[in-house]
């Protein structure tokens, strides 16, 4: 049976949680393969209950699904325990959550350094969430990180923390004029937190591969989006991991030949949180309309999202970079009540037309959108359950996005609820 990768095709916040939730009843496993609690998924159940998840996979809300925090994720122990407690309080069964022994832990010193670094950079800041994600990945690549399995051996944990703080305390005290952290206090805090999740630690790469061999279906759930990928995104305004499909194999331990479907999630317009280039960004009443109607506030940060028209250049780019086979188009309903809807089909960069993503960072910053306009619609589309039930102009808009993006739009979101979805083609195949 298949391994399906779910990818954000823009700058994150595309509605990946809704897609996971929709597929949940047909999945046996849902896996987070990268990132940390610097991104959020919102899921609205048929009864109206709304859940905001930051670290735990969205499949936790579907009974019978085993959820995995994979080796490519960086885990804040406190956030994990808080999120689990919140789900438990609301009656959600969290017993089927596993934690890769090889995932890295976000330590208190990662958070401290992240926050003071952003403040120090001031206007030149990248716009991180200040949750220690980047510093944790830095330690991982420098081979000095603390892994989940280290909480099972206090001696190893202590050695790693002492070695890390020998250098990081120098940075905190001498560069940023902050207090030094006590190694033993850090160790004690982490071990106390570990008591709440040690029973979940597992060899998840083995379990996932055995599940596929048994014919079970696995969904690999990315956080953030393609344009935030550290290699393929709008560098340096990116995250510290690989949300793209290549990261799914690395961050889960599933071989790439096991992946049968790459489902890209596209918002019917474009949003971005934080700093960085955004060619179709709107600063007028249209931008305000999209932000207000779409409820564009970051789940994790609470920051207002920047809004703009649909950008087909980055959609085509995402299709190629990820090998996307299908798209789930979300928030089409937000565009109702617009007379015309512009679509960015290319960029003007200093007088030269670009139909594909510019190679250089400078060109991306200089890019001005080239628009074509589509007629809008005024009908309420939230009750449409087949493509044919959409207004003709809405159908034409979807078909044009499909043509420009280069992959079939299999699902269309017409509202926030799980049932407010049109399925044109089954993505579980």
Curated annotation (Swiss-Prot):
The lineage of its organism: Bacteria, Bacillati, Actinomycetota, Actinomycetes, Mycobacteriales. GTP binds at residues 12-18, 40-42, 305, 331-333, 413-415. Pathway: Purine metabolism; AMP biosynthesis via de novo pathway; AMP from IMP: step 1/2. The active site is at 13 (proton acceptor), 41 (proton donor). IMP binds at residues 13-16, 38-41, 129, 143, 224, 239, 303. Mg(2+) binds at residues 13, 40. Belongs to the adenylosuccinate synthetase family. It comes from Rhodococcus opacus (strain B4). Plays an important role in the de novo pathway of purine nucleotide biosynthesis. Catalyzes the first committed step in the biosynthesis of AMP from IMP. Its cofactor is Mg(2+). Its EC number is 6.3.4.4. The keyword 4Fe-4S does not apply. GO terms for cellular component: cytoplasm. This is Adenylosuccinate synthetase.
């Amino acid at each position: 049976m298949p391994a399906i990768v779910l990818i954000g095709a823009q700058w994150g916040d595309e509605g990946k949680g809704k897609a996971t939730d929709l597929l949940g009843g047909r999945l046996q496993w849902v896996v987070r393969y990268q990132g940390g609690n610097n991104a959020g998924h919102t899921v609205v159940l048929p009864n109206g209950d709304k859940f905001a998840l930051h670290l735990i996979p969205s499949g936790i809300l579907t009974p019978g699904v085993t959820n995995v925090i994979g080796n490519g994720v960086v885990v804040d122990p406190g956030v994990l325990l808080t999120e689990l407690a919140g789900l438990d309080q609301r009656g959600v069964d969290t017993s089927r959550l596993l934690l890769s022994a090889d995932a890295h832990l976000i330590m208190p010193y990662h958070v401290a350094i992240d926050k003071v670094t952003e403040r120090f950079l001031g206007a030149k800041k990248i716009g991180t969430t200040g949750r220690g994600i980047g510093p944790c990945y830095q330690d991982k690549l420098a081979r000095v990180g603390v892994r989940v399995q280290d909480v099972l051996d206090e001696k190893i944990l202590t050695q790693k923390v002492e070695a890390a703080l020998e250098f990081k305390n120098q940075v905190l005290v001498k560069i940023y004029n902050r207090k030094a952290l006590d190694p033993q206090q850090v160790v004690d805090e982490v071990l106390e937190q570990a008591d709440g999740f040690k029973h979940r630690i597992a060899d998840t790469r083995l379990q996932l591969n055995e599940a596929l061999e048994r014919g079970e279906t696995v969904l690999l759930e990315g956080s953030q989006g393609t344009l935030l990928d550290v290699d393929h995104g709008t560098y340096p305004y990116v995250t510290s991991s690989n949300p793209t499909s290549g990261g799914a194999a690395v961050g889960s331990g599933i071989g790439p030949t096991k992946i049968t479907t790459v489902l890209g999630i596209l918002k019917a317009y474009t949003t971005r949180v934080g700093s960085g280039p955004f060619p179709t960004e709107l600063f007028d009443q249209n931008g305000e309309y999209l932000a207000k109607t779409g409820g564009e506030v970051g789940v994790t940060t609470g920051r207002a999202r920047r809004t703009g028209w649909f950008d087909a250049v980055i959609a085509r780019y995402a299709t190629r970079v990820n090998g996307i086979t299908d798209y789930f188009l979300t928030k089409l309903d937000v565009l109702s009540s617009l007379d015309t809807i512009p679509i960015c089909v290319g960029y003007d960069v200093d007088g030269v037309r670009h139909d594909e993503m510019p190679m250089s960072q400078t060109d991306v910053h200089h890019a001005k959108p080239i628009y074509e306009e589509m007629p809008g619609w005024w009908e309420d589309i939230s009750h449409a359950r087949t493509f044919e039930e959409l207004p003709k102009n809405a159908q034409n808009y979807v078909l044009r996005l499909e043509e420009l993006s280069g992959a079939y739009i299999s699902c269309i979101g017409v509202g926030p609820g799980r049932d407010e979805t049109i399925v044109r083609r089954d993505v579980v195949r």
